[in-house]
Structure formats: structure tokens, C-alpha cells
Amino acid sequence: GLPLLDAYIRQSYLDNFLRGGYPFIMGGDKVVHLFSRKHGDPERDYNWFAIAGEYYSQGNGNFRDVCQNRRCDVRLHPGVKDYNVWAFYSFVQADGYNPLEIRPAAFRVRDMEAARRLLADSMYDTGAVAAVIEKDFTPGMVSGVIAAHEIVLACPEQELIDGLLRLSEQRAQASFVEGYWSDHWDYLLDLILDYLAVYPD
């Protein structure tokens, strides 16, 4: 390789995932951007951010910042596929505006009966985990309740979480915060180009 270019790519990769989050593939095709957060000087009030105090933590970030820092996700993590295109374009309104803030991704179980069977096969007392997945949840919430209740599993924890996510739909989330914006077309187009570079068909 080219040492200087390799060093540049390594640093850009680090910078991107410290802002846009590290794309972690779970449940076969679900993407959770770990450690995502708003970037900028933390001493400025408008750069406030919060990262969930849980396993598989995610944080909030501004639409533009997160979008621009995920523009190479597919080239570096092909398993991301069209997730970023789906997530960001889902927030664009008919008038071209999008909300300011991207919130951590959550999940909602589509087949609760199958999820209950999975829990029953995985643990003796399903109550605490069942209560978590009855509403929108994150992988960290499931992992946290298992740890807090010292639940003994009949399978690896990651296998259980993957199974729950396979039975769930992913819910991209955003928030108005200080307003709506409309100047992100180039960044949005970059998400499509990144996807097409790896999946041209």
C-alpha cells in the first residue's frame, strides 16, 4: 500500500466513527452505530450530547454531522448496505427539510409470540426481558436488564439479542430540537454513491 494514504484513511476512519458511530451489524441485517455522538467543542451549549449509559451505547447528533461522517460506511463495512440511505432519506420531508437531530436507533418486535418463544427457550424467568421488548427497545436495554437481574441464559447473550432483532423492525429516530434544515443534498447524495460503489446492481 501507500503508507501516507493508509495513515490518512486510518485517521479518517477513526474520526468518522467517533462522530457518526461505529456501524455494528446485529440480527443479520440491523445496523447499530455504536458510540455515535454530536461533534464539536463540548463547552459550547449547542454541542451538548448524551450517550446512553448502556451496553451497545448510542448517542444523539446533528443530521448533517452524522450524515457526513457515515458517507464511507458501506465501503468500509459492506454489511451496512442501504441502511444509511433508508435512515436519512426517511427524515426528509416533501419540502426538502429534515429535523436537526438524529436520535439513537430503536427496535420494535413485529412478532411478539415468536419473541416470547425465543425468551422461553433462552431463560427460565422471562418477565424482565419481556417487559423491555413490549415497547421500543435498544440492544443495550436488553443486555442491561439481563445483567441487572443476573439472568442465566441457555445461549450466548449475543445470540439472544440477534434473535430478538431478527423478529423486530428497526426504527430510525430524529428530533426537531432547534429547527429544520435543508442544505444537506450533497451529503445525502454521497450516501447513495457510497452504496452504489459497493452494490452497483
Please place each PLM-identified region on the residue numbering.
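Acidic, mature catalytic/reactive cores of soluble proteins
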Residues: 1-201
